[in-house]
Design a protein with these regions (language model features):
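N-terminal secretory signal peptides that target proteins for export/translocation
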Residues: 1-11
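Bacterial N-terminal signal peptides
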Residues: 16-27
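Phosphodiester-processing cores and adjacent nucleic acid-binding clamps
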Residues: 30
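Active-site-adjacent loops and short helices of periplasmic peptidoglycan-processing enzymes
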Residues: 33-181, 185-194
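Domain-terminus/edge residues, biased toward the C-terminal soluble/receptor-binding domains
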Residues: 161, 172-232
Length: 232
């Protein structure tokens, strides 16, 4: 995931989860109910800290404010692919010229590349690849437009109530929005999948191209790069 002031980052812990949007830092922590703990100081415009098991809200700041979710959108893309494709992720993906035309950040796929859908998904999460997100959308649902509809259905199933996803990558688009509460609910829902947990935690990944030399990439998430506790 991209960790820039104009984008959003995600960091998960097993039991405690915090989601913040746009210019925020997201981190996992533990909470003791036996003693008073002062509310954390945060520069994020919107923040939610929840227990990922019980969905109890432990801390909130503007939890339902509409925000642009930026690259956290790819979390929904991953979850939607897992929900819809299940065990069919070993199929070779078709790479379109439209997918390769996306603005950065990108995984670097090319038309004609031979790579499984799972390989594209993994690369999408590690490199925050906008091109890979489009490849996922087109191969899962036939088009970006159809995939966006599927994203919204999956997000609602996960508990999101105030989100509209119009693309799989998170590039700015009018009407594409979410909230800190919704992203927290979506992330907590996704954590039930082992594959989801694995793919949001990778530091390095060797992209398994079958038609050219596999390429090793590193995550754009500086929390994972710097071994921040709970980031993986």
């Amino acid at each position: 995931m991209i960790s820039l002031t104009t984008n959003a980052c995600i960091v998960w812990k097993r039991l405690i989860l915090m989601i913040a949007c746009i210019g925020a830092i997201i981190f996992g922590t533990s909470v003791s109910h036996a003693a008073y703990i002062a509310p954390p100081s945060t520069i994020g415009e919107a923040v939610v800290l929840i227990d990922a098991d019980t969905k109890e809200i432990l801390f909130a700041k503007n939890p339902d404010k509409w925000m642009h979710p930026a690259s956290t959108t790819k979390m929904v893309t991953l979850l939607t692919a897992l929900e819809l494709k299940g065990t069919q992720l070993d199929e070779l993906a078709t790479i379109s010229s439209y997918a390769t035309s996306m603005e950065e950040s990108n995984l670097g796929v090319r038309v004609g590349d031979q790579i499984t859908l799972e390989g594209v998904l993994e690369g999408m999460m590690v490199a925050s690849g906008n091109d890979a997100a489009v490849v996922v959308a087109e191969n899962v649902s036939g088009s970006v437009e159809n995939f966006a509809k599927d994203m919204n259905r999956v997000a609602a199933k996960a508990g999101a109530k105030n989100s509209v996803f119009l693309n799989p990558h998170g590039l700015t688009q009018m009407g594409h929005h979410s909230t800190a509460r919704d992203l927290a609910m979506i992330a907590a829902y996704g954590m039930k999948y082992q594959m989801f947990r694995d793919k949001v935690a990778n530091d390095y990944y060797k992209v398994p191209y079958q038609n050219r030399t596999p390429e090793t990439i590193r995550t754009t998430n500086h929390f994972i790069r710097n071994k921040y506790p709970g980031a993986n």
